[in-house]
UniProtKB/Swiss-Prot annotation:
A biological-process GO annotation: tetrahydrobiopterin biosynthetic process
Broadest EC class assigned to this enzyme: hydrolase
Associated pathway: Cofactor biosynthesis; 7,8-dihydroneopterin triphosphate biosynthesis; 7,8-dihydroneopterin triphosphate from GTP: step 1/1
SUPFAM superfamilies found in the cross-reference section: Tetrahydrobiopterin biosynthesis enzymes-like
Catalysis performed (reactions): GTP + H2O = 7,8-dihydroneopterin 3'-triphosphate + formate + H(+)
Residues that, per the record, bind Zn(2+): C71, H74, C142
Subunit structure: Toroid-shaped homodecamer, composed of two pentamers of five dimers.
EC number(s) stated in the UniProt entry for this protein: 3.5.4.16
Protein's organism: Helicobacter pylori (strain ATCC 700392 / 26695)
GO cellular component terms attached to this protein's record: cytoplasm
Name by which UniProt lists this protein: GTP cyclohydrolase 1
Pfam families: GTP_cyclohydroI
Encoding gene, per UniProt annotation: folE
Length: 180
């Protein structure tokens, strides 16, 4: 890692021995371990260990779960909120497990579209609800800092499975809950 940063500093015309940069390779290495720890965790385990047989058969919504991730195209952050709604069949999941699922997938090099799909597919596979919906809203620093340089653009993605995909009233109920 140190050689990588020494070459990087040299390529941009920076002095690798400058006081403020001497410890940067070590600091960044520790930061990257934290930012990308999602590769060392199994998102399925996070859900499998946190569900129980439920008595609820109505919609459950976890709204505005904050996340940050790193765009795999430019290695710049994107951050925002994810909301997950589901209609249980037999299993109900602890709300913190939904946040953990989001954290595991977002702590990887990502694109927003895949992040949204992975959350929905894993939830659907492990919890087996009658329906699941995932809505992700994010600001991409790669869009703000370079290229088109649009500071206030918000990108929204969604994935629908089961009743949310088949029934427009169910979708509308979820969207109304997000607004209230």
């Amino acid at each position: 890692m140190e050689n990588f940063f020494n070459q990087f500093f040299e390529s941009i015309g920076e002095d690798k021995n400058r006081e403020g940069l001497k410890e940067t390779p070590k600091r960044v290495q520790e930061l990257w371990k934290f930012l990308y720890k999602g590769y060392k965790e199994d998102p399925r385990v996070a859900l499998k260990s946190a569900y129980f047989q439920g008595v609820c058969d109505e919609m459950i919504v976890a709204q505005n779960i904050e996340f940050y991730s790193t765009c795999e195209h430019h290695l710049l952050p994107f951050l925002g909120n994810i909301s997950v709604g589901y209609i249980p069949k037999e299993k109900i999941v602890g709300i913190s497990a939904i946040a953990k699922l989001i954290e595991i997938y977002s702590r990887r090099l990502q694109i927003q579209e895949r992040l949204t799909i992975q959350i929905a597919e894993t939830f659907d596979e492990i919890i087996e609800p009658r329906g699941v919906i995932v809505v992700c809203e994010a600001k991409h620093l790669c869009m703000s800092m370079q290229g088109v340089q649009k500071q206030n653009a918000i990108i929204k993605t969604s994935v629908l499975r089961g009743l949310f995909k088949k029934d427009s009233k169910t979708r509308a109920e979820f969207m109304q809950l997000l607004k209230s």
